[in-house]
Curated annotation (Swiss-Prot):
Quaternary structure, from the entry: Heterodimer with CHKB. Homodimer.
Naturally occurring in which organism (per UniProt): Rattus norvegicus
InterPro entries given in the database record: Kinase-like_dom_sf
Gene that produces this protein: Chka
UniProt KW keywords: Acetylation, ATP-binding, Cytoplasm, Kinase, Lipid biosynthesis, Lipid droplet, Lipid metabolism, Nucleotide-binding, Phospholipid biosynthesis, Phospholipid metabolism, Phosphoprotein, Transferase
Bias-annotated ranges (Pro residues): 55-73
Cellular compartments per GO CC: cytoplasm; cytosol; lipid droplet
Residues noted as binding ATP in the record, renumbered to the chain: 113-119, 142, 203-209, 304, 326
Subcellular location: Cytoplasm, Cytosol
SUPFAM superfamilies on file: Protein kinase-like (PK-like) (SSF56112)
Modified residues (N6-acetyllysine): K243
Gene3D superfamilies: 3.90.1200.10, Phosphorylase Kinase, domain 1
Protein name, as recorded: Choline kinase alpha
């Protein structure tokens, strides 16, 4: 979700739906970008994404800027002509009714800002064109970004490794497309109107994303808990083994240990991270979580404010005013990670407009009272007999879950700390990745101290 913007690729629209090409022209090709470091200097970047374990969706990058309809379309910002042409053909070929006879000069498209793993556009019919049936007048076009073009962190990676990463990225997109279609059919996500190798057409939902400070509002927090519990209760046709979490951390750690920076400031920052003895920390974390009871459920894996929509017109409703989006990183995983990761996101504001483009406040981590409020709402939805338990049994269940999610919050910090170090090498986005990694590791060690582990 937050790896980078990329420009369109070469391939023309394909009507073959789920046929996913792994070739270089099948995915949007990133444009070469530069990133400004803390001193204001520009450093050229090799673009690329994150490599993932086979047969599992890719990991969720933490919430730097965000996806579907976060920001309104920019009326004065148009895509490049090639992207506009391809968008027109996709809409004309995949959408019914008035779209079928639409001329290209009648086609309206505008950029939606906020997507960093993908490019997002609003495509619409002009007011002068009448609807034929119940076809949508506006749709969201998502062009896949980094996930399809995963690359090793170092240029000296073997061709075999590069091909494997590319295959894994393509495989992840197939899985995500299947997942999106299933959730759409179950009315748990936006409707799916079209799918093709380079992206998809989705329902455009009038809404806005939540702000970080809204996560702590009691009614918002309770509904997020209920939505997450419903998500966790789903049966999905994916690998049920919880390999994603530690498989991803191991892969990131191996990449971090091979990283080389040319700038002295980056070299010193990397040395500081390596001084933490990250391999030993990972093994200690693995040992701790092995003895932490946490059911394996179908997890969102990126339930932060940018992936939660507040539906337009539902702002004053008591319930059913939120929708979870961006399922591309979902997988079977430990429940404690999904909830602990959500709690960690209370601390980070990614809307700050100056370097390093985020603000961290460790004091924003939910209090015991706020955690219990979330957990109570979660258990009421997730566990059918929870409300029939005695007060003592309910209290014991909630205490166990408090320990579970706060231990797994350590994994959230560790995962995104490693991820951000890797992004400092490969991302073209202007963001303080090394500073963000430091913030996550600072929070990791603070959480360890509080837990006494």
């Amino acid at each position: 979700m937050k790896t980078k913007f990329c420009t369109g690729g070469e391939a023309e629209p394909s009507p073959l739906g789920l046929l996913l090409s792994c070739g270089g022209s099948a995915a949007p090709t990133p444009g070469v970008g530069q990133q400004r470091d803390a001193a204001g200097e520009l450093e050229s970047k090799q673009l690329g994404g994150r490599s993932q374990p086979l047969a599992l969706p890719p990991p969720p990058p933490p919430p730097l800027p965000l996806p579907p309809p976060p920001s309104p379309p920019l009326a004065d910002e148009q895509p490049e002509p090639r992207t506009r042409r391809r968008a027109y053909l996709w809409c004309k070929e995949f959408l019914p009714g008035a779209w079928r006879g639409l001329r290209e000069d009648q086609f309206h498209i505008s950029v939606i800002r906020g997507g960093l793993s993908n490019m997002l556009f609003q495509c619409s019919l002009p007011d002068s064109i009448a609807s034929v049936g119940d076809e949508p007048r506006k749709v969201l076009l998502r062009l896949y970004g980094a996930i399809l073009k995963m690359r090793s962190c170092n240029k000296e990676g073997s061709e075999q490794a590069q091909n494997e990463n590319e295959f894994q990225g393509a495989e992840a997109m197939v899985l995500e497309s299947v997942m999106f279609a299933i959730l759409a059919e179950r009315s748990l996500g936006p409707k799916l109107y079209g799918i093709f190798p380079q992206g998809r057409l989705e329902q455009f939902i009038p809404s806005r994303r939540l702000d970080t400070e809204e996560l702590c509002l009691p009614d918002i927090s309770a509904e997020i808990a209920e939505k997450m519990a419903t998500f966790h209760g789903m049966k999905m046709p994916f690998n049920k083994e919880p390999k994603w979490l530690f498989g991803t951390m191991e892969k990131y750690l191996n990449q971090v240990l091979r990283l080389k920076f040319s700038r002295e400031a980056r070299v010193q920052q990397l040395h500081k991270f390596l001084s933490y003895n990250l391999p030993l920390e990972l093994e200690n974390l693995r040992s701790l979580l092995q003895y932490t009871r946490s059911p394996v459920v179908f997890c969102h894996n990126d339930c932060q404010e940018g992936n939660i929509l507040l539906l337009e017109g539902q702002e004053n409703s008591e319930k059913q005013k939120l929708m979870l989006i961006d399922f591309e990183y979902s997988s079977y995983n430990y429940r404690g990670f999904d909830i602990g990761n959500h709690f960690c996101e209370w601390m980070y504001d990614y809307t700050y407009e100056k370097y390093p483009f985020f603000r961290a406040n460790i004091q924003k981590y939910p209090t015991r009272k706020q955690q219990l409020h979330f957990i109570s709402s979660y258990l009421t939805t997730f566990q059918n007999d929870f409300e029939s338990l005695s007060s003592e049994e309910q209290s014991a269940t909630k205490e166990d879950m408090l320990l579970e999610v706060n231990r797994f919050a350590l994994a959230s910090h560790f995962l995104w700390g490693l991820w951000s170090i890797v992004q400092a090498k490969i991302s073209s986005i202007e963001f303080g990745y090394m500073e963000y990694a430091q913030a996550r590791f600072d929070a990791y060690f603070d959480q360890k101290r509080k837990l006494g582990v």
